[in-house]
Amino acid sequence: FDRNLVEEKSAHNYVSYVDKESERQIIEALSTLLPEAGFIAEEGSGSLTDEEYCWVIDPLDGTSNYIHDIAPYCVSIALRNRKELLLGVVYEVCRDECFYAVKGGKAYLDGNEIHVSDVSVLDNAFIALGFPYNSDAYRPVAAHLVDRLYGFAGGTRLMGSAAAELCYVAAGRFDARIEAYLGPWDV
């Protein structure tokens, strides 16, 4: 896949050939697995539906990271029944890791059970942050957030892949993740 086949969806928000082709192939495969399910995907396939089952797909979370060959970037797939999430799977490409969970069950990384950290004090918390592409609208919130955390949290990182960072929280690598204005495919 050519990292240079890229379009700009909006200012600083990119879509690559890989996003589109990954989405096409995932939808094709999932359609055979559960034909009655609808789809909502980041690159525009499908929309929120009233169908009983709906796949929620981000075919390449962390597109900017992918374009620049920087980890992490991943594929994220969830299945919902109306508004209730039933399962989620995230494949983090750079680390070759597969995170998954089923509602009412445990969370796993490559078949091994994972847990969130037991850190409960902000001073010790290692926190992932995310900011949306529309930076002008979010600028006051982002500035306030960074100001509040700087010097109070044990550390912060901006990694560029919401799905991967949330999995890292589930595995105890991060203690929390903070971001507003996410799409349904990001979580």
Roles of regions detected by a PLM:
Residues N4, A37, G105, A153-G154:
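A structural micro-motif
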Residues D19, L30, T63, E92, ...:
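Residue-level signal for inorganic ion chemistry
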Residues L85, E113-H115:
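Short, solvent-exposed loop/turn motifs
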Residues F1-L60:
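N-terminal subdomain of lithium-sensitive/metallo-dependent phosphomonoesterases centered on the IMPase/IPPase/PAP
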Residues T49-Y108:
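DPxDG-like acidic metal-binding loop motif
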Residues K20, R24, E43, P59-G62, ...:
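Generic detector of well-ordered alpha-helical packing
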Residues H115-V187:
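An extended, acidic
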